[in-house]
């Protein structure tokens, strides 16, 4: 999209896919399980819902090879669409499984009460945890986590612990998305417009998020359907889809923007999750030099090409991108797709202290199929 004037871009906007903060406030964007745990770079649920409605019917199968926090999977289930989501991140898959699973809420409340009543405990040995938490906060978290192995809902308790761990870090309130260094004394808080102090305990976060988790799971129960959801913890460049799919709805990582494993480092350290950050595509740590962009294009093209054999005859892929480097024409070609249509949406709100606006494209891809009668080379 480089070289386009802003006036030209505004003229192409699909207003059904573009919302202002007034049209779509945060509490609406983060309905039910979508706010089960903060996730930087989350797919807007209403965008996923609109793309699913436009391209798929109830009973069909959608695939998200970059499933992230599970937005496509949750929205697909609510529409009666079967969903398969893949992600290389252990934390992402944990969060997705909790969002889409059916829960015994009575048993969950019991297990949460037990975990909240557990005494503070010694945390796992970790220099990172010791650096980012006050000792009492870390012992609160470790005490709660000590109840996870005996729970009937261990993964749900793990998500509650992770969410509390995010809030209890020695980080400024206005800088929870990507804090760079621990805050060890009073600071001017841009979020609360006053002087704040570092967090010393985690128990109040655990209580608050335990209650909120049960409420959000119950809210999703009111709209969920019987449609199957499968979460695959794997590199989407290497998996074989087990069945035909009727479409893709996905938002791939943008190059050089977010380190998804590092974003949730607290969960990996506290819960002992397997860190596979070396397999991330477009990680911020890799930068945006030519070599990094080439590797990114290779990875996205391999992922889309891997899914192509499973496409049904009318299947399309809706791929949401901020393609300011004009990478996706070549990615689509190399993956064996043509771009049938481009929709443009205006994004004018961002989380935390980040401000500004930008444009995203929704690329509608179709597999390039051999023409009938064409001779093999």
Question: Residues of each region from the PLM?
Answer:
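Conserved phosphoryl-transfer catalytic core
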Residues: 90-153, 273-286
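Conserved proline-anchored active-site loop of SAM-dependent methyltransferases
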Residues: 48, 60-79, 83-90, 96, ...
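SAM-dependent nucleic-acid methyltransferase catalytic core
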Residues: 141-250, 255-258
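S-adenosyl-L-methionine
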Residues: 1-58
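A short glycine-rich, Lys/Arg-flanked "PGG" loop and its adjoining helix->strand segment in the class I
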Residues: 297-313, 332
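Mobile active-site "lid"/loop adjacent to the S-adenosyl-L-methionine
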Residues: 253-299
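Class I S-adenosyl-L-methionine
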Residues: 322-333, 337-377
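Short glycine-centered segments of the SAM/dcSAM-binding site in methyltransferase folds
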Residues: 61, 314-318
